[in-house]
């Protein structure tokens, strides 16, 4: 799952990777003290001024609390850092239910594309994503608590999970809506997104189909990770990016 960062875990069961494999990735950097900015969430580059993430990352913060780093394998060094000019959370984002947990950050300066900085392909409205499809999650998954260390990008291969099964697994905890997409290694566990991976992408054939949103714990066999289902928001993304 992708809860709000609380302890310094990262992509579970995955392996280290490099930004040239996932050049659409952005690290979202947060400041507590208005001095140092540390990795706190993930994001995806949409175009030369927009980053897709989860609304629960910026929540109600002013844009000055956040910066983004692009083009670097390391979350807290390298690449290019951009200030954020404004934050557009989905108007129907509900922090209690985590429904519509999607947000776009606009950078103060244009993002320059390179081999390591590329705009993502996002799922269209009619994108057909079946059950048990191979998907990849990527992220740095470190919080400020371990932010003193250089953190390398990680990747993990997981699978899409049947919506009805996911609804039933979470029935006593929270509603899984049509706006959500479940992923993981069902009844095996050990692979998932985790704290600090929030807002980062879920890829299917290099198309972004999910945004890491929430879950019960991380990499549990019984509880899948839950993502924003990007295909439900294609029009919203295009009109706000």
Regions of interest found by a model, annotated:
Residues 1-52, 66-67, 179:
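Protease-domain processing segments flanking chymotrypsin-fold serine proteases, especially trypsin-like
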Residues 2-8, 63, 172, 188, ...:
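Secreted/processed peptides and extracellular or luminal domains of membrane proteins
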Residues 4, 74, 82-85, 102, ...:
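Chymotrypsin/trypsin-fold serine protease catalytic domain
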Residues 4, 8, 28-31, 51-54, ...:
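Conserved H-D interstitial segment of serine endopeptidase catalytic domains
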Residues 5, 14, 29, 60-61, ...:
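Small disulfide-bonded, cysteine-rich extracellular recognition modules and tandem repeats
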Residues 13-20, 93-97, 127, 146-148, ...:
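Conserved, non-catalytic sequence blocks in retroelement Pol enzymes and Pol-derived host proteins
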Residues 26, 42-56, 155-160, 195-241:
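C-terminal subregion of chymotrypsin/trypsin-like serine protease catalytic domains
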Residues 31-34, 56-61, 71-76, 108-113, ...:
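Acidic glycine-/aspartate-rich tracts in secreted/extracellular proteins
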């Amino acid at each position: 799952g992708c809860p709000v960062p609380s302890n310094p875990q990262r992509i579970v069961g995955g392996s280290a990777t490099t930004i040239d494999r996932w050049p659409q990735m952005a690290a979202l950097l947060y400041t507590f003290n208005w001095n140092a900015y540390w990795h706190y969430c993930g994001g995806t580059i949409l175009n030369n001024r927009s980053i897709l993430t989860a609304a629960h990352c910026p929540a109600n913060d002013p844009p000055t609390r956040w910066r983004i780093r692009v083009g670097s394998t390391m979350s807290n060094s390298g690449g290019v850092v951009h200030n954020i000019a404004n934050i557009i959370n989905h108007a129907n984002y509900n922090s209690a239910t985590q429904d519509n947990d999607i947000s776009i950050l606009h950078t103060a300066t244009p993002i320059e594309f390179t081999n390591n900085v590329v705009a993502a392909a996002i799922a269209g409205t009619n994108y057909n994503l079946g059950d048990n499809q191979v998907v990849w999650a990527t992220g740095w998954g470190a919080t400020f608590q371990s932010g003193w260390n250089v953190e390398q990008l990680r990747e993990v291969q997981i699978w899409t999970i049947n919506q009805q099964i996911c609804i039933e697994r979470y029935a006593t905890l929270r509603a899984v809506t049509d706006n959500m997409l479940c992923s993981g290694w069902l009844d095996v566990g050990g692979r998932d997104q985790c704290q600090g991976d929030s807002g980062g992408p879920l890829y299917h054939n290099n198309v972004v189909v999910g945004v890491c949103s929430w879950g019960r714990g991380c990499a549990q066999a019984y509880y899948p990770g839950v993502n924003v289902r990007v295909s439900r928001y294609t029009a919203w993304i295009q009109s706000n990016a």
